[in-house]
Amino acid sequence: MRRVLRFKALAVLATFVALNCFAFGTASAGPMSNTSVSWTAFTSTWAPTDVRVLVSPFTFSDGAAGNIVSVAYFSTGGATAGKWVYAYQIVFTSGSGKITAFSVVPTNYPATVGATPNFSFYTSKPSGATEFPDFRSGGIAPIMAGYDETLSEASWVFPAPNYIQQTQNSVVFGYVSNFEPTIVQADISKINGSATLTGKPLVFAASSEPALALLLGVGLLGAGMFRRRKK
């Protein structure tokens, strides 16, 4: 009888895992798409609702400083409908060196948008545009983007000649996820000797997958079944 109960509990776990993969998709790793989208798509077609904005400073040990503008919203239109959109902009206000990379960790994996898996995007705010006033117009675009499943890290790279230097800013860039926002610290890399990021900015990012907690609960339930049968 004990073996039968153990088999049933394992079957429940296996079924839950299968349903979880179906409902949420499987975690992904590798390059993100780094797709160029229009400002109109980002501000109108994707129909932003529940918009959240966070402007957070960063500082380096050599005195270089700036801000990260972070936006999260729930999309109700276009190809991203039903998903959360996360967008960032690097503003390098003062100091020497060249910003070469930006990453968010931990964050959940990027969603598939349309036929594009691991969807990420960048867009340039036109001069005079009034939407999302905390974002600056124009800027430097990332050359590539990626997601590391092991580290739960989304990253964007600004190599030569696309360095971000003093008084410059990046374009608006980000990714899309099925998961709601949380606030985490971001990392920034800069070329300038041994300068380190001493003041990390806070940004919005996709929160941890809730199904994992449910899976743990089912596992504990199964363990409880085993213990009760042994009494």
Question: Predicted segments — roles?
Answer:
Residues 1, 13, 148, 220-222:
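Helix-centric, low-specificity signal for extended rod-like, repetitive segments
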Residues 2-12, 210:
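Bacterial N-terminal signal peptides that target proteins for export
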Residues 10-16, 216-219:
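Sec-dependent N-terminal signal peptides
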Residues 16-26, 226:
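C-terminal segment of classical bacterial N-terminal signal peptides
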Residues 30-205:
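Extracellular or exported targeting regions of proteins
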Residues 208-227:
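A short, hydrophobic C-terminal helix/tail in secreted or cell-surface proteins
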